[in-house]
Amino acid sequence: MRHQLRVPLLSKPADQRKALLRALTTQLIREGRITTTKARAKALRNEAERMISLAKEGTLSARRRALGYIYDKKLVHSLFEKAQERYGERNGGYTRIVRTVARKGDNAQMAIIELV
């Protein structure tokens, strides 16, 4: 039964799900906006906000944790440089999810997730 299950499974084994979320988080931080399915966007929101919160913290341990999660080292450094000025006064809510039209092939609900 799914009682109290807080992690969205996304129909993938744990290793594939973690790799997918890491890749989506890296792409979102690099591009600022990506189009994906609604379920993936909701799962991605938690990870992206966690990385931005680490960047706002700005400590060495936070930087090392972000380097262990985000695939691109240069992207982590640029995130840590820009996060404090961009999100300094904001306490959470760094992303926005906007629903779009369903995907043509399988009618999956699509969404655009973007950094605010």
Curated annotation (Swiss-Prot):
GO terms for biological process: translation. The keyword Ribosomal protein applies. One of its GO terms (molecular function) is structural constituent of ribosome. GO terms for cellular component: cytosolic large ribosomal subunit. The keyword Ribonucleoprotein applies. PANTHER family: LARGE RIBOSOMAL SUBUNIT PROTEIN BL17M (PTHR14413:SF16), RIBOSOMAL PROTEIN L17 (PTHR14413). Belongs to the bacterial ribosomal protein bL17 family. Part of the 50S ribosomal subunit. Contacts protein L32. This is Large ribosomal subunit protein bL17. It comes from Prochlorococcus marinus subsp. pastoris (strain CCMP1986 / NIES-2087 / MED4). The gene is rplQ.
